[in-house]
């Protein structure tokens, strides 16, 4: 069976393969990012989005793969064979998991359309001969201001505002209250 885990999201394994393998952060960094950004949604018994479901599956698969690697490391006596297995898991399976984690975290952070546009623009850039392309690759974080603002509004990260923020907002509240009383 030829299963493409990105198909339902409008992408493909081929499109993600345009990004070089060293582009993707380590699995540990990606897992930490997923936990920091979406821990509640990932641990929730309720369905949040297809990206959250895919992230859960990728995280579970990576955990099982690490269990297998630990078992192999403990039970395979030949050091050369053990090293081959560990290397294969880290290089091949690790890259696939890093791609999956990066894609779904990016979609949740920046929006699916922005990530797909980025993948297409990077694919065009990388396939253009160096003499004819701009020197710098497209950057995913170069987003319209509205996308960044909208994302921050959806996920309350801080329970209480910082003291500096509280001070800057209190005069506004007073002004708006005084305007209401004037109307």
Curated annotation (Swiss-Prot):
Keyword Phosphoprotein attached: yes
UniProt region (RNA binding), positions on chain: 177-183
Family of this protein: Belongs to the orthohepadnavirus core antigen family.
Sequence repeat placement: 155-161, 162-169, 170-177
Record has Lyase as a keyword: no
Subcellular location: Virion; Host cytoplasm
Region described as Disordered: spans on this chain: 136-183
Protein name (Swiss-Prot/TrEMBL): Capsid protein
Modification after translation (UniProt): Phosphorylated by host SRPK1, SRPK2, and maybe protein kinase C or GAPDH. Phosphorylation is critical for pregenomic RNA packaging. Protein kinase C phosphorylation is stimulated by HBx protein and may play a role in transport of the viral genome to the nucleus at the late step during the viral replication cycle.
InterPro entries xref list: Hepatitis_core, Viral_capsid_core_dom_sf_HBV
Keywords for this protein: Capsid protein, Cytoplasmic inwards viral transport, DNA-binding, Host cytoplasm, Host-virus interaction, Microtubular inwards viral transport, Phosphoprotein, Repeat, RNA-binding, T=4 icosahedral capsid protein, Viral penetration into host nucleus, Virion, Virus entry into host cell
Short motif Bipartite nuclear localization signal, span: 158-175
Cited function: Self assembles to form an icosahedral capsid. Most capsids appear to be large particles with an icosahedral symmetry of T=4 and consist of 240 copies of capsid protein, though a fraction forms smaller T=3 particles consisting of 180 capsid proteins. Entering capsids are transported along microtubules to the nucleus. Phosphorylation of the capsid is thought to induce exposure of nuclear localization signal in the C-terminal portion of the capsid protein that allows binding to the nuclear pore complex via the importin (karyopherin-) alpha and beta.
Example of a GO cellular component annotation carried by this entry: host cell
Main location: virion
Organism: Hepatitis B virus genotype C subtype ayw (isolate China/Tibet127/2002)
Biological-process GO terms, alphabetical: microtubule-dependent intracellular transport of viral material towards nucleus; symbiont entry into host cell; viral penetration into host nucleus
Region called 3 X 8 AA repeats of S-P-R-R-R-[PR]-S-Q, residue ranges: 155-177
Gene Ontology terms, MF aspect: DNA binding; RNA binding; structural molecule activity
Modified residues annotated as Phosphoserine in this record: 155, 162, 170
Subunit organization: Homodimerizes, then multimerizes. Interacts with cytosol exposed regions of viral L glycoprotein present in the reticulum-to-Golgi compartment. Interacts with human FLNB. Phosphorylated form interacts with host importin alpha; this interaction depends on the exposure of the NLS, which itself depends upon genome maturation and/or phosphorylation of the capsid protein. Interacts with host NUP153.
Domain of life: Viruses
Biased composition annotated in UniProt, kind: Basic residues: 149-176
């Amino acid at each position: 069976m030829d299963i493409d885990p990105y198909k339902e999201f409008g992408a493909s394994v081929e499109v993600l393969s345009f990004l070089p393998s060293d582009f993707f952060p380590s699995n540990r960094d990606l897992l930490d990012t997923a936990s920091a950004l979406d821990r509640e949604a990932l641990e929730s018994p309720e369905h949040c989005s297809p990206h959250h479901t895919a992230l859960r599956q990728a995280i579970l698969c990576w955990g099982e793969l690490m269990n297998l690697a630990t078992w192999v490391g403990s039970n395979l006596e030949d050091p050369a064979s053990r090293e081959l297995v560990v290397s294969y898991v880290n290089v091949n399976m690790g890259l696939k998991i890093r791609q999956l984690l990066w894609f779904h975290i990016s979609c949740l952070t920046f929006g699916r359309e922005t990530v797909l546009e980025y993948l297409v623009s990077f694919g065009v850039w990388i396939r253009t001969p160096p003499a004819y392309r701009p020197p710098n690759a497209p950057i995913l974080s170069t987003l319209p201001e509205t996308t960044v603002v909208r994302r921050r509004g959806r996920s309350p990260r801080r329970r209480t505002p910082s003291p500096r923020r509280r001070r800057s907002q209190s005069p506004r509240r007073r002004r708006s209250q005084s305007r209401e009383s004037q109307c």
